[in-house]
A protein has these predicted regions:
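Alpha-helical transmembrane-bundle signature of multi-pass membrane transport and export proteins
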Residues: 2-423
Length: 423
């Protein structure tokens, strides 16, 4: 059979545009940052299983396990804003080195507590709050390093590469943690966590110094408020926050996964795990074909479409009655959320000047971390008043309505062109 070289070339070109864009990894400093954060993220995800498992086995109280979420939520609402102000005022590499050191120390304390004959439950709560606080303090500095390490045309590719290890760690980390606990015991998970944070420290140490550029504001309440003031009138930034909030508040039914798995899908505990893993699996698969995101010009349109696909997939998930269709639609939702996150992150980094980027990253992290909790609350309350199916389906529909309303109310967000990054 004759092969058409023209069509073969077109297919090759399409494949290159679709596959994950690895150009940023050719740059040594970005590669070191990526490796360091990938190591610590995987270790952190492995460790996430250990704390709730230990609390439950020591107390046999699901209420106390639930309170761990409160110990995490309070720092997530405050500390990222402080971390953003610090990232804009100090050397960002130095901030990361200190936070990685702090995370390693906390992992060592978790390990020491686990090795006691009678581990202290109160210590688990205190250390969990400290760990989340330190992580939230360093996250804005880490997120705001990318524009200093790659050119504008590679920012979308860098954002996609970050999501590669995030999604892979979210799927594999807890599974590895569970296997480790079953095979070797809880202390091993904390030990691996300690090793990964230590390794991450030495990789980040290889980065060049990252002092502030331009004007420097000392970390203060005024500096934090300046970040919020910068948002005023900048529709591209307001739009990315509003669309993601609509998607997470209305279309985030993860709190209902146990009930859906057991009652609507007639499954068991394993089914619950599959539902939690499905969106991250979709995100990982999406990351493998994310090369096209570097060529998107109308990013506001892209964010809106991706968020609407998320809402539609969640609504479809609400109608499912068996596992495989449920996982399929959740994977579609996860892939859509991945593409939305890449485009939102790219817009944020391109629109925001470097001297404010840490603070805007702090605001973004606070929003991303807290909105799903509101979504769980909305889904749970509505399901208790109506039904599981109505809560999920109506949430997906409201997500679509909210995203379209945002796009119509913020025309500059919808018209944002990547060739003109200034807000």
């Amino acid at each position: 059979m004759a092969i058409d070289p023209l069509h073969t070339g077109e297919r090759t070109s399409l494949f290159r545009r679709m596959r994950v864009d690895t150009r940023p990894l050719r740059r040594r400093d970005y590669r070191n940052l990526w490796i360091g954060q990938a190591i610590s993220t995987v270790g952190g995800e492995i460790g996430t299983v250990a704390v709730p498992y230990q609390v439950y086995t020591l107390t046999h109280s699901t209420a106390l396990v639930g309170l761990l979420g409160l110990a995490s939520l309070i720092p997530l609402l405050v500390v990222p804003l402080v971390g953003g102000a610090i990232a804009d005022a100090l050397d960002r590499r130095a901030v990361l080195l200190r936070t990685e050191t702090g995370m390693a120390v906390v992992a060592a304390l978790f390990l020491a507590n686990a090795l006691l004959a009678h581990p202290r439950v109160w210590a688990l709560f205190v250390l969990q709050g400290i760990a989340v606080s330190i992580f939230s303090l360093g996250r804005p500095a880490m997120s705001s390093l990318t524009p200093r390490l790659v050119p504008n045309e590679e920012i979308a590719a860098a954002a996609a590469l970050t999501s590669v290890y995030n999604s892979l760690a979210a799927v594999g980390g807890p599974a590895v943690g569970g296997i480790l606990i079953a095979a070797a015991g809880v202390p091993w998970t904390y030990g691996i966590d300690l090793v990964t944070y230590t390794a991450s420290f030495f990789v980040i140490w290889l980065l060049p110094k990252m002092p502030p550029l331009g004007e420097v504001d000392r970390p203060s309440l005024r500096a934090i408020l300046d970040g919020f003031r910068f948002l005023k009138g900048r529709q591209p930034l307001i739009g990315i926050f509003a669309v993601d909030t609509a998607a997470m508040v209305f279309g985030m039914p993860t709190a209902l996964f146990p009930a859906i798995a057991l009652h609507q899908l007639q499954g068991d505990a394993a089914t619950v795990g599959y539902l939690y893993a499905a969106p991250y699996s979709g995100a990982f698969l999406g990351s493998l074909v994310s090369g096209w995101t570097s060529h998107v010009r109308r990013m506001g349109v892209g964010v809106t479409i991706a968020a609407c696909v998320w809402g539609a997939a969640i609504a479809a998930f609400g109608f499912t009655t068996s596992l495989w269709p449920a996982m399929f639609f959740l994977a579609i939702a996860g892939g859509a959320d991945f593409f939305s996150a890449v485009l939102r992150s790219t817009m944020l980094m391109r629109v925001t000047p470097d001297h404010l980027l840490g603070r805007l990253q702090g605001i973004e992290f606070m929003q991303v971390a807290s909105a799903p909790s509101l979504g769980d609350l909305e889904a749970g309350v509505l399901a208790s008043l109506t039904s599981l199916r109505f809560s999920v389906v109506s949430g997906g529909v409201l997500c679509i309505v909210g995203c379209i309303a945002t796009a119509l109310a913020l025309p500059k967000f919808l018209r944002y062109d990547a060739r003109e990054p200034a807000a």
